[in-house]
């Protein structure tokens, strides 16, 4: 049985619904692991999954055994991680520990590129970060996923939008996460299956809602709808030339800054 990992966030449960419910033809049975993306990054590091959602920030350490698929990505515009604090201010003025959702997340890599002088950093589950910021346990927090839509309800203020910064710096969309498959897997099958699952979800969004709500941190329909709209885009159907350029720009610039190992050309599976 194929092991498949993805997060319980609405964008992932939405796009994988058809695949995991047997609605895509000629797909072998899957054993699903639902876990936050940093846990999936770690599982992939231990070669523990056949196909998995991954942070693009984790990819440089994994390419010996895995290749990125062209469908299933979270790439877009206006969807970047935010740095939040209890009081309004400037990112460069933050003094003290910053909560992060993991050291292999793309969000953390973007923060290191944007403000290399900041730190120390305190890794924790992404949904714990707003609470710790509000309680004064950390000076600021790097937020992703559903917390991007709910931080203001906790009285927090955005100091920086790292996606906006990235788009201004590069002119490219924000590459957050993608799908890895083991190089010895049937790559063509999984690219087809995931693309068909994405297309099925776009065509039948109401059918996915119960499964999405079952696993979401936030149950309000407007939050779920905003989450899916922001992170499931045309790039999710197929990464395309622009999306691939965004991923390569992230990995190349991070390697130049000595934050990640250098990646060769064989990052994405062929179309």
Task: Please report, for each region that a protein language model flagged, where it lies by residue.
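Beta->alpha turn/N-cap motifs
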Residues: 36-38, 47-60, 125-126, 142-149
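Hydrophobic/proline-rich hinge and linker segments of small-molecule sensing/allosteric domains
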Residues: 68-90, 167-183
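Hydrophobic residues within well-ordered alpha-helices
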Residues: 44-45, 133-134, 254
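Pocket-lining segment of extracytoplasmic ligand-binding domains
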Residues: 125-214
């Amino acid at each position: 049985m194929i092991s498949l990992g993805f997060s319980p966030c609405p964008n992932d449960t939405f796009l994988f619904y058809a695949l995991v419910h047997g609605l895509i033809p000629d797909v072998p049975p899957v054993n699903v692991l639902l876990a936050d993306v940093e846990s999936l990054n770690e599982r992939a590091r231990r070669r523990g999954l056949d196909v998995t959602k991954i942070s693009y920030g984790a990819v440089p350490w994994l390419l010996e055994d895995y290749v990125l698929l062209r469908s299933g990505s979270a790439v877009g515009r206006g969807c970047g991680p935010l740095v939040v604090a209890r009081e309004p201010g400037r990112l460069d003025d933050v003094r003290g520990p910053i909560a992060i959702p993991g050291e292999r997340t793309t969000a953390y890599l973007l923060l290191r590129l944007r403000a290399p002088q900041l730190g120390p950093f305190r890794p924790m589950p992404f949904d714990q970060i707003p609470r710790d910021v509000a309680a004064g346990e950390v000076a600021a927090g790097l937020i992703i996923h559903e917390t991007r839509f709910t931080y203001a309800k906790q009285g927090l203020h955005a100091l920086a939008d790292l996606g906006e910064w990235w788009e201004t710096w590069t002119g490219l969309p924000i590459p957050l996460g993608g799908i890895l498959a083991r190089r010895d897997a049937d790559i063509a099958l999984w690219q087809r299956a995931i693309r068909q699952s994405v297309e099925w979800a776009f065509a039948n969004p109401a059918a996915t809602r119960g499964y999405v709500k079952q696993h979401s941190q936030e149950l309000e329909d407007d939050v779920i709808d905003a989450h899916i709209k922001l992170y499931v885009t045309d790039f999710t159907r197929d990464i395309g030339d622009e999306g691939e350029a965004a991923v390569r720009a992230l990995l190349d610039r991070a390697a130049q800054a000595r934050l990640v190992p250098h990646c060769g050309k064989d990052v994405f599976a062929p179309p």
